[in-house]
Amino acid sequence: MLMRGWERGQGYEHGHGHEHGHGHEHGGFWERRPFSEVHHELTVAYATHKIRRVLDDGHEQVDEVRLRSYNGKLVGPTIEVCPGDTLKILLRNQLPFKEELVGDHPHVGPHGANVTNLHFHGMHVSPAGNSDNVLLSIGPNQDLEYEVKIPTDHPAGTHWYHAHKHGAVSIQLGSGMAGPLIVRGDIDQIEGIREARERIIVLQQIPYRLVTDPYDNTRQANMVEEFPQLFEVTWQRELVPQGRRVTLNGEVLPTFRLRPGEVERWRFIHAGVHFPFRLRLVREGGNPATESIPYYLIAMDGITTGRLDQVDVTEMHPGYREDVLVHAVGRDGRPLARGTYLLVDEVEQNPGARVLARVVVDGPPKMMRLPRPEALAALAPFKPIRDEELTSTTPQEARFEVQVVKPPPAPEFRFLINGKEFNPHDPSRQLTLGAVEEWVVSSVGAAEFFPGHPFHIHTNPFQLTDAQGRVIWKDTIYVPVGQQVRLRTRYRRYIGQFMLHCHIVTHEDEGMMQLLEIVPPRQDAGGPPGGGSGSHH
């Protein structure tokens, strides 16, 4: 792996790879030569890993698993770039050629599990050619060099890359084929963040099939090969009771260490395949309702909010990223008492599986300051979209729908957008470059099985209004069944085809995806550019 174009800034330190108990860390900030080429190589192949299981009685067991992986690791390498850089990634597919694992039919459901590609999730870059083009297919023993030109005005933030070959997304992402993609920039250099140590925390659900019967040769032991094991119900009813746990940078129950009074920047990336997380920091043995440790939300989906919002809990659905500042002080402003604290997931119903990490506060005090809110306010990258900026009075519609084809006890479903399953041969929904539009996104059907769907759209972020009436920018938003969300977005800079889909990726592989295309304005069109077609056609 070669990364060019970076120089160390003062006080820089970095925890390479995924060292036990540390994750990805750095202190200080990057200085760079502008407009550099950043080179990486990703080799996709089966690799053997060790993953701990934690049983309800406290006993632990280490499973040896065999998974499709990047560069032989459970989490892909961290890639760091600056605005104006060109990212070049040589993707080598060294998965074995098997006829049943390379086919492209049917168009929905699992297929082509050994064919791959890359998506640069959250990046505002071209979706065409060998850039962020998820229509590419790289088969076994094939290589492709991606070339991603990052615009000079790209906001600094937390993004990620992952496999996105339709029909194979869930099996490959469920195997851990994902890694952090960090855009460095202005926010990294402000006082209160520049001095903070950083942890990149990749949260994953690896639903490998556990086979304990040595005479059972009907299934692939300790691998992710079977589509049903990727669904939410399998994780909840079968895998968690076996001791399966969420991994953080490939580890189960890592330990993080802070000094009293210290500030750290944690970059959370939900790279899992199904359940959301509700993350809270609490003192070990304490009451979460009264003894949680607040932290400060500064970015969502890689986009600086421009605020320093104190929160007790953060809710993350698949595809989400959240940057928080953890300040090791109590609610009274004094250094946090030495001891052990826990990062817990309140979504998890099994009490033994709620703890995701231990946070040990120890050592001499290191009193650090948080950034000033006005310094963050100056870094919010986008202006709100007001009514007068809209170029169409008719919103675009995206309706996630699950139809129950066969009822329990062996239910079957269809996963649709606007009444249709994804078909790559259908015409794309046409959108016009330069248009500014509103979207109405809703979820309907089968709420007892699937309570909602995270809407994700490639290439351009969108704005929405949160429960407090504030404008926020994201690229992924959860839409509960029976509700709708109104979004606004600008189709800036890039033409080409890209996707919107549910980021519970089993739903995506089953057809809950739609092809979009941004096209140049018609030459005979007068006035401001118009909108899109309003429907898949």
Residue ranges and their predicted role:
Residues 119-121, 162-167, 453-460, 501-507:
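Histidine-centered divalent metal-coordination motifs
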Residues 321-323, 327-329, 341-348, 375-386, ...:
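Long, well-ordered mid-to-C-terminal structural blocks that present hydrophobic/aromatic surfaces
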Residues 158-164, 278, 331-349, 493-505:
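Short, surface-exposed ligand- or partner-binding patches at beta-edge/loop junctions that are enriched
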Residues 397-464, 475-501:
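C-terminal substrate/ligand-recognition segments
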Residues 283-302, 445-473, 505-508, 517-522:
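Active/binding-pocket-proximal capping segment
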Residues 80-82, 137, 257, 315, ...:
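Residue-level "contact hotspot" at macromolecular interaction interfaces
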Residues 1-325, 330, 358-381, 388, ...:
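Histidine-centered copper-binding motifs that mark active-site loops
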